[in-house]
Amino acid sequence: MTETYDIAIIGGGFSGIAVLANIVRAASQPLSLVVISRDEPHIYGPAYSTPRPEHLLNVRAEGMGLFDTDHKGFYDWAAARDSSIKPGDYLPRRLFAEYLTAIRQKTLETAQQKNISIRFMRAEAEDIRPGTQLTLVTDKGDIHAADIVLAIGNTLKAKEDAQSEPRLVTDVWHYDYAALAGAKNIKSIAIVGSGLTALDSIISLLNCGWTGQMTCLSGGAQLPKAHPPVYDKTKLKAADRAHFVGQRPSRIMHELRKSARGADWHYAIDALRPFTQDIWKAFSAPDRLRVAQRYFNLWNLHRHRCDASIRAQADKAIAGGTLEMVQARCTSFHADAAGVDVMLKRDGHDETRRFDLVFKCIGVNYAVANNPLITKLIKKGLLAPADNPFGIAADAAFRAYDGAGGVIHALGTPLFGHLFETTAVPDLRHQAARVAADVIALREGALRSRAAGAGE
């Protein structure tokens, strides 16, 4: 039997919970919602599901609130539990997951008061079919909905070829690091990738009592930059929008260097945040593709930074020889019971290196081709691709489809090719608020039309 809801949200991570909470908070009429996720309701995506206290947020506590009208919401919640917490602290991600659970519980209580029904359904979304209503096809059955929200979060590159080999680790957040402390047969570990996920592994290895050799393998061989130890907001000056929006990438790089000259580069980068998406949208299609392929990693290093204490631990390991940074591209892996052979491209030559253990920390794959649902919907013509391989198109209300049967909204990762900066909490909470407002306007408008028709 097909179930019918007003709204179906695909994704139960931060984006999905943010859309749900915003809808319930703002709704003035009864609604029915279903949240579809492959995980249990208390799991908010891989990074936020980590149980490890050393895995920290990379945004200050005061900026991690779920609601766009309350940026300090997370800090206020955390400080009420622990008065030693400061607004500028980078807190454990597991604490942030507890905050999301508290938001979810409060949302359920508010929904009950407003006669809004919510169901959490553990299922895999497989297809969407248009008709008199949209039909969401899942592996647990079909769902009719007038509005479907794609809040599907990040697709990790390591999941593309995830293996069950015990020597080749793809889930670095739930690995039993403590077991390594006394493991005499694990003397060399490779970390593939050098972004924030790689830092999670490095820090856990440094803190678990293991004393072997780490080798970080990546094309850039650079770890994320650190935030200033103390963020001085008085140094954050407004950037001249005209010097950046509508300019070619080379000109923007020139302006950035000029802004940072004789000053702290952190604040020059951060000054672009209010209009980074406008810079991206003003690029020509060839420039967007060029920036995504050639400069994205460089941008990420400087824009998506880590807590200074985390970077200091990694730098100490590099200086002491415990951590080796190697510029190389990993082409394939062969794991056996005793270790992993890693095939590399290094300085134009093929090379094979043997490690006792490998952590794959190669981050997010923004390519449309990596997401089966998005790929299927584009092939059917239900969604339009961006003008590059990295996402889908959407309008100002984040509608990706508006036609027969209803509306499909999208936020977060699927919009990377359209918006560029679209995965950090400050971006996601703004998108969630906009999506929720549009969903409510559509649903409550439909209810008013139905009531008016009944009265004629």
Predicted features along the sequence, with ranges:
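Flavin (primarily FAD) cofactor-binding/catalytic cores of flavoenzymes
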Residues: 2-40, 46, 83-242, 253-447, ...
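N-terminal glycine-rich dinucleotide-binding loop that anchors FAD/FMN and/or NAD(P) in oxidoreductases
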Residues: 49-73, 232-248, 309-312
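Extended, charge-rich low-complexity interaction segments
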Residues: 68-77, 250-258, 419
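Active-site-adjacent bridging/hinge elements
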Residues: 74-78, 407-410
